Structures are given as structure tokens and as C-alpha cells.
Amino acid sequence: MPRPSHLNPDDILRFLQVSSDAASANEISRGLHLRKSDQRALFKMLGKLKKRGAIDELSGGRYRLRGRKDEPGAANHGGGPSLRESRSSQAAPPRDGASPTPVRILAEEQSLARDEVRGRLVLHHDGYGFVVPDKPIPELDGDIFIPRVAIEDAMHGDHVVAKIQRRAGYSDRQRAEGRIVRILDRAHASVVGLFRYGPRYNIVLPYDARLQHEIEIPPGEELTPQLREKLIAHDPAFDPKSPHARAKRIPRMEELDGAVVNVQILRFPRSGATPVGRVIEILGRPGELGVDTEIIIRKHHLPYEFPPAVLAEAEKRAQLPSESELADREDFRHLPIVTIDGETARDFDDAVYVERRENGAWHLQVHIADVAHYVRNATPLDQEARLRGTSVYFPDRAVPMLPEALSNGICSLKPQEDRLVMSALIELDPYGNIQSSRLASGVIKSAARMTYTNVNKILENDPEVSAQYAPHVENFRKMKELALLLNARRTEHGSIDFDLPERVIAFDDQQRMTSINRSERNIANRLIEEFMLTANRVVDAYLLHRGIPALHRVHEKPDAKKVLEFEELARAFGYSLGVEDLHRKEISVRHGTIPAAKAGRQQGGKGSRDRGGRSRGGGARSGGSENFGRDREMRVSLAGAEVAITPQHYQRLVKKITGKPEERILSYLMLRSLKQARYAADPLGHFALGFDEYTHFTSPIRRYPDLIIHRILKWALENPDASPRVNSPTVAARHAVPAVARHESRHDAAHLESRRAQTRTPAENFSAPSAPEKSALPQSAGEAVRYTDIQLREIATESSEAERRAAAAERELMDWKTAQFMEQHLGEEFAGLIISIQKFGAFVELAEVFVEGLLPIAAFEEAAGARCTYREFDHSIVAMSAGTTSYRDPYSRSEKSRSTYPSSRGDQSALEPPRKGRGAKPPTQRSWHLGDPVQVRADRIDPIRKRVEFALVEP
């Protein structure tokens, strides 16, 4: 009986995509390393792909992707999956040392069966996984669990179709379960890993533990001709013709054993067959300087090389502005405008200036680099910027969105150099309320390049720094005064200010880490934040007032379930959000007492994941139910229930905990309860800031959405009489509610009534467009653009994904660096604070160095000399000693063990289960809670997760 073929149509499409020319069947067979027995299947599949319109057959029996033109000189490069492909039907072959873009399988748009769900597969390093649905599904409160045996040939990150085999059960532990039935597109066209030499064949072990397939490297694919040329160029010792060659040879395969390599996947796993790939880059050895950064760049598929055409265009565009360009702009060069940035910043994209009027009113100018003048729409430079989406900042280097000729050159607002800008000119009353604003194109000459450190010293009356910048000292004091007023007005409207520090690594001259510290956020940082927030707000208000479709930075109201979970945790510390009827809603939801009619009305409620994945603090439980239908109704009610939560509830709690020992942990938990901010074509408002209108306008050098806003703004200023597209869903939704009503819908009515006479929203301040004449802006094609709603939605989705990708890469490399730093301190003891508790242990944040690590459950058991367990109802770890009795969890129908150890953590009467009568044993049980101080010892580094693990030190 013949063996089943491992041939996959996706493999053929991918091969044709990365090929520099059309390929014959024999070339495809050799490239995919097919068996002779697969030849008939190959021809049959080529015929099917041709019939479906996926490929074209050329003369001579050669094939290529439909709609593609052969461009031998074209090249793709390292980039995120499916972003470039979504923009162009033409696929280019990869450059050397680059991650090719995957091909989307034809079945993507197939209709789904009733029990099928389309989503993204997220695998766990233990083998199982979850499918995160593309769209919230009312019947599913969460993700779909996929057992190891049901993953089939899918890989982590793949876009898949899952067939639901079991619906969610009576508790959160029994979520919906399914299996993978189709793979729509592959997330990884390349994989970075360790090269392992073998006598018969070589393999690459992926660095991402969630990629659970070894990559087989067939003979001849370890060192391709292109890679050999690159090795020779890098080190003449490998050139057989060089007189300096040590051995006049290419290194043997065994010499590559243990090297870090980047592998292009030629054949994905199919019917149990191992995936096959070829080495396209040799990055170095683990532990070598900079190799960890290179690994993270490729692991997260960050575009890491600019194509030659993009670099050439950037050099061509990076010319000093001509007199004709300057003549058509408003001239601000006579004003003492300054930039304020970090110590190591080189891309200065914002500059500010403040005036105090004689009547006490304020005039604020925010000038932003006019990147749209240099990066024109639909050019190679623009396409590359869109692919990248954002600049990525690592501790030791950056991966910029734009080439250096622009980002650190002509677009950077360097001191004493003429620079083109887009300007927001804002008038405020003496109390910091916006009265009017005007947007214009301009030219500035920065008077000084300031740093946050020096501005802060000036504001603290440092005599040396104040003398150095004497001409600007008074202006900085005005900036501080205005910034405090703006912050006060923002606070009145419910803006939440989480002061959570970030990790900052200090290096010596040899790039060795010397410390990991908390970032400082001084008054200089805050004044720039306030000015940028104000500028972003007035730009969005202007575009909304004009009815022009735009990108918005939105932050939606948190889900009811997340609010309830946080409320439960806050009560353990004696705090509450103070939401009316929240406790009654919680009890009703937990016990399934919400009326069926109300539950039915709420089934359309939109569920959402939390802002950064699953919270480390654990989640609130849904009460058990003996009736599946009733429980399903209860779960839907929880996902879609409305809770009257406002930013003021969070803000009031932030004020209560400021300066308290529990501030760090509760601020972290509050942040986790909120949704993740994103880009959208609809003006949904920004919950955390308390704004109805908000966009990103102030960082076009490093964020693609800001560049889009600049183009839209230019179009709006060039066309002051253009009527809004009222048939646009975005515009229609905005115009459906008056501005004042929109504003009031987000704030307490009583509070707004007292402020109405003196406060107006930015949107209300545009009674007439205040813009220069149409001829005042350059008329070059591609500089001013009006986008359609469809285009904006695509860009919003891509930009949000790019932002999350960049954040994940930055976070992971920081974890790697932290692990490397702590390797030097293994065995040392530290004071720490428990900031999160899960079933497998507690996460501890150290006080001396800003490092977070895991205190495993085994460490508690070793310290207590008894078995320890995670107690879910109050998120604690409890030692199951002789003082344990039995109780029934008030939120569950199952028996639990509970502690009779008296609580010293404030009033926990609402959380602690009642004691079991007079028969309770003495309180001999130990427990650990969120916020508890602990003494730990750096014990080991988890080699898979690159995570520090601690041991508990007894006092």
C-alpha cells in the first residue's frame, strides 16, 4: 500500500512566492524535497491550483503565482506575517538573511460550519493550546481549549479554524474544547533556533518553546550559495581564494553545531512529517554580545533591514527645505521653541512653546515634524513604514520605522536647523480650559535640545543648569504652570493616571549591564505628556468637527467581568471602586439569578480579552450550576452585563492608594482590569483619559498612525470647504449625537453641570474651520490624502497588531536581559513584594533592583514543610497544615479546604468564608497574600522562559 503523500498546497504556494522566477514541476519537487512517489500528486495539485486561479502555467511547463510579475532584482525581507501580502498581490523573493512572508491558504474565505470558529492559535510550551476567536462569540465566554492531540499540523500563531467538540461547562475550569480542522495562514515563514549537527541530517531547535517541531535541515540546505557569499564577505578567512584564509574552506557542519541560525521553512508539518527548512542566517553563538537582540528581532518577525529601494528613496527625499517650500508655510523661527527628550534620543519629533497673555490666558504651541512631506503615500518608503508600523526600542539598539536619513536626519527637529512642521496652536483660558485652536503647516528652528533631566533640574532651581540655559528658564516655569493646570482639568474629567515605572537597564562602556532600575517620571516628563495629550485631542476634535474619516486612538470601557474580578481583589486590601450596586450584580451573576429575559438581551454583549493577556492575579470564578442551560445563560450574562463604571471610579481609588504600601500592587491590578488601547476608524473615545476625542498626531517619526493623521490633516487644510461624507458609517455615527451630549455621556451629570459654564470640549471650539488658504500647502501628490473607511480600518488593524508585536518583543528582550543580569546574583538574598499569585506560585518584585521573578509553589512548600495550595476566592497560597478544616466556597458548589488563620489584612469579612462552628481546629495554618513582603533568594534561571526563580528565605 503506498504511503500517504505529505504534499501540501500551501508548500507549493510558498515555494512559488519565494522563488525569484517561475519554476518547473521538477524545480518545485527538488525545492520541497519531495519523494518520487509524490510526483503524481504534485502534478495533480498543480492542476487544481491552476484551475482555482491561484497559479499560472507559462510556456515550458513553468508555474508562478497568479498576478505576479517576475522581478529578479526584487526582494522581500524580514517582516511580520501577512502585512505586506495584504497590501500587494505581488510577492517578492526574500533577501539573504531575511524572514520571508507566509502565504495565505486558499481556504481562508471558506464559509464556516455552525460549530466552527476562526481564530488565532496560541500554544503553551507544555503542548496544549487555545484558539482566540477573531470576533467575540456570545456563546463562548473566552477562548477555545485545544488539547495536544487535537492540534494536528498547526503551529503557534497560525490562523486556524477550530471545530468545537464540547461547549463550556459549569465552571471557568471547563471551557469550550475543540480541535483544529483547517489552517488558514501560517504565522511563521522563518524560525530562529539552535543548529544541531547530526551524522545523517541536521536539525534546528526553535527558541520559541511554543513551536514544538524540530526543523529538519536536509543536506545542501545548511549553507546555501548566498549564505556562503555572506560568510566570505563577513570573514575573509572563509574565502578559499584569500591568502589570509586560515583553512581556505567553508566551515564544516559540525563547526556550526550550537550556532544560532535563522531558518526559512520550506515545508510545514504535514501528517506527522517533520517540517523542513534551509539556513538563511548565522547569527552567532548564544551569549555573544548582541545575539539575544538579533534572536528577538527574528523571533517576533520584526522587519530588520530596509530594502535598497527604500534607502535610496529616503536619501533622495532627505534634502534641506527649499526657499519655495518655506515660503508657503507659517514662520515660527523667531520664537524660542525647544525640544525636550530623553538623554539618548536622536529622533526629535516634537517641539513646544508657551506664552502667558496679559489677561492671564495661555497660548500653547506644539510643533510636530512634518514627516508626511518626506514620506509620500503609496511609495516604497510608505509601504515599508506601514509594514513596520512602529519603531521598536530595545535596551541596546532600536529598529526604526523610517531610515536614519529621515528619522535622525531631516525629520528630526535638531537645534539651529530649519525644519518643516505641522503645528497645533492652542488658546486656553487662565484655568487651562481650551478656548480655541488652529492647525497649520509651518517652519521652526529649535532654539535648544533639552533633556528631561536638565529641565527637571531647572525647575528644581539647580543653579548650574539654570545658568547654562538662562534664556529659557522663565519659559520652562511657564510650561510647568500650564502643565499643572492641564493636568488638573484632565483630572476633573476623570482621567486616570497610573504612575507605574518601567525597567531601565544601565550599561557600562563595554555594554555590560550594571543595574536594572525603575524609570523616573519627573515634572519635565509630565509637562511634555500634557502638551502632547492636548495636541492629540484638538487634532481629533478638528477632524471630527469637519466630518473627515480618520484614525482614532480608542480605549473602550472595561468588561463587567474584569471589573468584578478587580473589585474582589481590591476588597482583600480594604478598598473598593465604589460602583453602585456592583456587589449585588456580583452576587447575582455568581449564583445565576439574573432573569432569563435579561440574560437573553445581554447575549449580544461584546466580550474581550484583558489588556495584556491573562492577568497574573487570577480570575474571579463563576458559580457552579447543575443545569447546563442555566449556567450558559449565567455565563453569557456575565460577559455582556453592563456595569456603570466610569473613569472617576478608578481615579478616586488611585487617589486613595497614592503613597500607600499597596499602591504598586493595586495600580498593577487596576491596569490589568482595563482593556488594551488600540487604533480604530470609529471615534469610540478613550476611557482611561476621559476623552471623547483622541488620536495620535505627535510622533509620526516612530508611529505609522500619526503619519496617516498628518496626511489627513493636510488634506483637510487644503480643502477647507469640503463637505463631510455623511454616508460614511464613522461620520454618521459621530453626527448622530450632539457634541455636548457626547461629552456628558462619559461623565457625572452633576459634575458637568457645575463646569458647563466655563468648560467647552475641543470639538465645540471649532465653530468655523481655522485653516490657511488652499495654496498655503504644497500640492505634491501623496502628501495630503483622504482615506476611505475601509482603508482606515485596515490600517487601524495592522497598526494595532504592529504595536502589540513591538511591545511583546521589547518585553521579552527585557526579560532575557533581566535573566542574564540575575545570573550574576544567583544565591544572593533580596527583599521583595508579592504582586501576583497563580496556581503554580507567586510573582515577586524585588525592592533593591527592579526585577520580577517567580516564587514557585514548591518554594512555599519547602518553607512551610507542608503541601501548599492556591486558594482561589482570595487569591492566596495556603499551607495545608493540621489547622485545616473544610468549608464550602461561597462562590462554588464544591467542597474546599480553608484556613482558620486569622487575617491581619484589614476587613476581609466579605471574602473570608464563615467558620465551621465550634469544631474548628486552632489557627496553625500559614498563608501568603497579594502585597505581602517576603525575603527571597535568587535560586535559578528558567532556561525556557528566561525567567528568574526564587527560593523563600525564612525570617
Q: Where is each model-derived feature located?
A:
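Charge-lined substrate channels and their catalytic hotspots, especially those that engage the 3′ end
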Residues: 1-365, 372-417, 449, 454-459, ...
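Electropositive polyanion-binding surfaces
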Residues: 210, 257, 262, 267-271, ...
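Compositionally biased, low-complexity intrinsically disordered regions
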Residues: 98, 732-735
